[in-house]
From Swiss-Prot:
GO cellular component terms, A-Z: cytosol
Keyword set includes tRNA-binding: no
GO MF entries: ribosomal large subunit binding
Family: Belongs to the RRF family.
Record keywords, A-Z: Cytoplasm, Protein biosynthesis
Pfam families attached to this UniProt entry: RRF
Protein name: Ribosome-recycling factor
InterPro entries, sorted: Ribosome_recyc_fac, Ribosome_recyc_fac_dom, RRF_sf
Coiled coil spans: none
Subcellular location(s) per record: Cytoplasm
Role, per record: Responsible for the release of ribosomes from messenger RNA at the termination of protein biosynthesis. May increase the efficiency of translation by recycling ribosomes from one round of translation to another.
Keyword Ubl conjugation in annotation: no
Length: 185
């Protein structure tokens, strides 16, 4: 019973960390990265479709993304979707290939992005702590129902705290990496 609670908590914490990493990878740095455009949705035959399902996105060099659209007639819609996004990008089309040059980030914009990333990291920490609280509540309920001893309860809560510390450390490491990436010139 206790092992199931710990396993569930660990899986949920792992998902929280992965969600955070995915979230902060979408934040634009000065370097070209294909996952920068992951959140962009294109109108494809009247249905909103993720960009990566209608085109291939690759980093051409450090400051340019190249988008190869599978259906040439879709190129204008892809350009429009990129311009409508809040990424501040201006794509240029050359047939089926759309090039997206990434302008260098200003110091002020970098600091704003760091604030956003730190806020995302704090949300990740809060979700980890909420998972810890849920697991501890379940363990306390087992103690209350006399299914486990007080020693088992304490031992389990200590193990869950160690899990919590480990996952919060992973969040802090991801944050540190992203901050360093943002401050590179």
């Amino acid at each position: 019973m206790i092992n199931e609670i710990k396993k569930d908590a660990q899986e949920r914490m792992d998902k929280s960390v992965e969600a955070l990493k995915s979230q902060i990878n979408k934040v634009r740095t000065g370097r070209a990265s294909p996952n920068l455009l992951d959140g962009i949705v294109v109108e494809y035959y009247g249905a909103p479709t993720p960009l990566n399902q209608v085109a291939n996105v690759v980093a051409e060099d450090g400051r340019t993304l190249a988008i190869t659209v599978f259906d040439r007639t879709l190129a204008p819609a892809v350009e429009k979707a990129i311009m409508a996004s809040d990424l501040g990008l201006n794509p240029s089309s050359a047939g089926a290939i759309i090039r997206v040059p990434l302008p260098p980030l200003t110091e002020e914009r970098r600091k704003d992005l760091i604030k956003v990333v730190r806020g995302d990291a704090e949300q990740g920490r809060v979700s980890i702590r909420n998972i810890r609280r849920d697991a501890n509540d379940k363990i306390k309920a087992l103690l209350k129902d006399k299914e486990i001893s007080e020693d088992d309860e304490r031992r389990s809560q200590d193990e869950i705290q160690k899990l919590t510390d480990m996952f919060i450390k992973k969040i802090d490491e991801a944050l540190t990496l992203k901050e360093a990436e943002l401050m590179e010139f």
